[in-house]
A protein has these predicted regions:
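Hydrophobic helical h-region of N-terminal Sec-dependent signal peptides
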Residues: 9-15
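Bacterial N-terminal signal peptides that target proteins for export
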Residues: 1-9
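Intrinsically disordered, low-complexity regions enriched in polar/acidic and amide residues
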Residues: 4, 22-23
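N-terminal signal peptide c-region/cleavage motif recognized by signal peptidases
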Residues: 17-19
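Extracytoplasmic copper-binding redox domains, predominantly the cupredoxin/blue-copper superfamily
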Residues: 23-241
Length: 241
């Protein structure tokens, strides 16, 4: 039989949880990737926006291990899917090989540095993204393969769709630093887009964010800092480093 004081404590906890949920809001934004002063790109996907409290409050993201689906970057048809993956810090990301040949996934520049070595079709490798950062992912065999993994120490983030729509659900009202990342933009441009915003109850919107696209990307090097062995693909390019 449940004791009366236990019921009181349980009721209080449920009430507090309900109030917390009621105070959360969905933040929305629309992004436009600008190829020129007046020309918009047709595809505005893969723009990442995230929020961090300005008062230094640490918000623990949900560990990937507590999710039913582990994050993964699949290798298929000599490409990574998805091209941009955002994960909480502490996530163990899977890199399954779905192609009928070997891959050698690596990242040496920013963010997490690793070399998974050669592994065959049907096998997988894991990487722990244990600190915040942006990791540029390549294959040492196939120059045309590239992807980005962004590890964040906040649960408040969203990724734009092709129309440029961004949704960040479950945000607690308060003051935040809003940061933006886009693969085709220069770092200085993205840095200037960082700003403080206030999230209130109900719903909040940032309106339209215009992101100037940079110059065409340059070729990247292989795992050993050398050019890829010919024949090279038609467009073995990447924005960073």
């Amino acid at each position: 039989m449940t004791k009366p004081h236990s019921l009181i404590v349980l009721t209080a906890l449920v009430t507090l949880a309900g109030l917390a949920c009621a105070q959360q809001t969905t933040v929305t934004a629309t992004v436009a990737v600008m190829n020129g002063k007046k020309t918009k790109a047709r595809d505005a996907s893969n723009v990442v926006i995230w929020l961090t409290p300005t008062d230094g409050t640490v918000i623990s993201p949900l560990p990937a291990a507590q999710s039913f689906l582990r994050p993964r970057l699949v290798q298929k048809d000599k490409s990574f899917e998805p091209h941009v993956l955002v994960v909480p810090v502490g996530s163990l990301v899977q890199f399954p090989n779905r192609d009928p040949f070997f891959h050698n996934v690596f990242s040496l520049f920013e963010g997490k540095r690793f070399d998974l070595g050669l592994y065959e079709a049907g096998s997988t490798r894991d990487v722990l993204f244990d600190k915040p950062g942006i990791s540029y992912i390549f294959c040492n065999i196939h120059a045309e393969m590239s992807a980005v993994v962004i590890a964040l120490n906040t649960p408040y983030y969203g990724i734009s769709d092709r129309r440029g729509q961004v949704l960040i659900p479950g945000v607690t009202p308060g003051r935040y630093a809003m940061r933006v990342w886009y693969e085709g933009a220069l770092p200085d441009t993205l840095s200037m887009m960082t700003k403080e915003i206030t999230v209130s109850g109900g719903s909040s919107t940032f309106g339209l964010l215009r992101i100037p696209a940079a110059n065409p990307p340059q070729e990247h090097k292989n795992l050993y800092g050398r050019d890829y062995t010919p024949p090279s693909p038609a467009n073995p390019t990447y924005v960073h480093p």
